Each structure stands twice: as structure tokens, then as C-alpha cells.
């Protein structure tokens, strides 16, 4: 199998720990209001509703807006689910800022630095450009490029997102490996000709109909239990 020239990283849940960031924001809100709020349930509901909003974009039910607009719409739905929870504009902004302050998983930055010696490293994400730029700065990591689906004609996991993302990189799909913890993301990328690299997830995601599925290890170009192991294999493969 030919070697990829570039790696395209999913980041939400793969590289960045969205859950801990939202937990912190919800705990701060709960402390300020002196209310018991189930931060785990809130975070999972918000993440799930984010995917619901993306599906609405896929279905042409709403315009192709960026993830900041989508997570705000998702938040409004979640707030109605937590009856009796009223938030001010300032508190709402405090919650939304969590998506711009996500930290990377601990094993990722050193793995990324090693991978940069062998490959171009890009982000290909449903998150907004500013979410990724801000969270990358928080985590002290840099990329060769950030490709947000807000600039493409479709969101992942539509094929257009992967094809257009590769075109932005100036590469053919078969020259790029998608890196993610979500098997459905990898499968969708593979259908366009991209290679698949899998890292086992470090947090639990909500069960999203049509998106949640088990990994298919035999079909992956490389996989690891974490990013260190994945980087070991990718650097060895390309040696």
C-alpha cells in the first residue's frame, strides 16, 4: 500500500477533550446559581444535539452555517431539556466559550511533533475554524493547516467534505490518511479513497444514530491504543 503524504485529523473528541471543557463550564454555572446540574448529562446532551444540528444542515433544513452557530442552537435545545434552568446572556456565553477552550489529550502533542517529521498534518473538522485555532493555542499545538467544513460545501460525513478537503491540501484522496477515533468518520473518508488511521477513543461519546459503530481494525492503514502507539506505527511504516 502506498504511503500517505499527509494526515488529516478529526479533532473534536479525537484530539480535543470536549467533555472536560463542557464539564468545567457547567460546574461553574451550577456553582454560580447554587443549583445541582448533572454536568455529565448536560455535556452528553449538548454533544448529541450538535450532531442533530449537523444532520439538519445535511438535510437542508437549515443553512450551511458554522459550528459556533450550530452549538448555540444545540444549547438552546438542551436548556429546554433541563427544566427550570434559566441562563443570562453572560452565562450563555460562558457555556459557549467551552468549545474554544478544549485541551488536547495528554498523549497527542508529543505524537504530533513526531508525525510532523514524516507527514504534512492538517485538521479536517466539523468544528469552526476559530474553535480549532483557539483550542490549539490552549494546547500549544500547531498544524500545517486547519480545514473547517464551514469553508466547504458540506459537513463530514458527506463525501464532498473529504474530497474538497483533500483538494485544499493539493493532494489526491489516496495520498491522505484520515485520523480519527470515530469509525464512521473513517469509513466515510475511505469511500472517497482516503486511507484510515484509528486511535482508540479516550472518552465516551453519545450514541448517535447512524454514526456510532464499532471499529474495523483489519481495514485500517494503522491503528493504536493511543496517539503514541499510532505515531510509533505511522513513523515505522514510513521509515
Regions found by a protein language model. Give the residues of each.
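Active-site neighborhood of HAD-like aspartate-dependent phosphohydrolases
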Residues: 1-48
Amino acid at each position: 500500500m502506498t504511503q500517505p503524504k499527509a494526515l488529516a485529523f478529526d479533532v473534536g473528541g479525537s484530539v480535543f477533550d470536549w467533555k472536560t471543557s463542557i464539564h468545567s463550564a457547567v460546574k461553574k454555572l451550577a456553582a454560580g446559581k447554587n443549583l445541582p446540574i448533572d454536568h455529565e448529562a448536560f455535556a452528553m446532551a449538548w454533544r448529541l444535539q450538535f450532531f442533530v444540528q449537523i444532520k439538519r444542515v445535511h438535510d437542508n433544513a437549515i443553512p450551511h452555517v458554522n459550528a459556533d452557530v450550530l452549538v448555540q442552537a444545540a444549547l438552546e435545545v438542551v436548556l429546554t431539556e433541563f427544566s427550570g434552568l434559566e441562563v443570562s446572556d453572560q452565562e450563555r456565553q460562558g457555556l459557549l466559550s467551552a468549545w474554544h477552550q478544549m485541551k488536547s489529550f495528554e498523549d497527542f502533542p508529543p505524537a504530533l511533533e513526531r508525525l510532523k517529521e514524516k507527514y504534512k498534518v492538517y485538521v479536517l473538522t466539523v468544528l469552526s475554524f476559530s474553535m480549532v485555532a483557539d483550542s490549539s493555542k490552549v494546547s500549544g499545538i500547531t498544524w500545517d493547516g486547519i480545514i473547517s467544513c464551514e469553508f466547504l460545501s458540506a459537513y463530514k460525513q458527506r463525501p464532498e467534505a473529504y474530497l474538497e478537503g483533500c483538494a485544499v491540501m493539493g493532494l489526491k484522496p489516496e495520498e491522505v490518511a484520515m485520523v480519527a477515533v470515530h469509525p464512521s468518520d473513517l469509513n466515510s473518508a475511505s469511500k472517497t479513497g482516503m486511507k484510515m488511521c484509528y486511535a482508540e477513543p479516550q472518552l465516551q461519546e453519545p450514541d448517535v444514530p447512524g454514526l456510532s459503530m464499532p471499529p474495523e481494525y483489519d481495514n485500517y492503514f494503522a491503528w493504536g491504543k493511543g496517539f503514541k502507539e499510532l505515531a510509533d506505527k505511522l513513523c515505522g511504516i514510513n521509515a
